[in-house]
Design a protein with these regions (language model features):
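Absolute protein N-terminus
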Residues: 1-4, 112
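N-terminal first-folded block
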Residues: 3-47
Length: 112
């Protein structure tokens, strides 16, 4: 996987920005999952995390796992209070109307 930042990913895709406190964060992999306890133990530092989970607990998991960003799939959005927490914890959050699979396919092309 080539070196790419979250900012560069945004330039090469149609992903939307929800929060971007650390756009220079380097992406080193991709992880897909919605079961937070599972993601917490398996996502790697620097991963893009694709999920439909959009609550405060997902922000906490992204922080603990040190993911480069969260991509919310299928048009999922963040409530304003969750968005505020994401910004306070320096969690980049992007969104897409695509399914997790469609996002993963796009990322495999862009990140290779």
């Amino acid at each position: 996987m080539g070196n790419m930042t979250v900012n560069a990913l945004l330039e090469k895709t149609d992903l939307r920005t929800v929060t971007l406190p650390d756009g220079d964060r380097e992406i080193t992999g991709v992880y897909i999952g919605d079961l937070l306890s599972w993601v917490m133990g398996r996502a790697q530092s620097g991963d893009v995390w694709i999920t439909i989970m959009s609550n405060n607990n997902s922000i906490a998991v992204a922080s603990l796992a040190d993911t480069a960003c969260i991509i919310l799939a299928e048009g999922v959005t963040l409530d304003e209070d969750v968005k505020t927490v994401a910004e306070m914890k320096d969690i980049n959050v992007l969104s897409s109307d695509k399914t997790a699979y469609e996002i993963a396919v796009e990322l495999s092309k862009v990140l290779s």
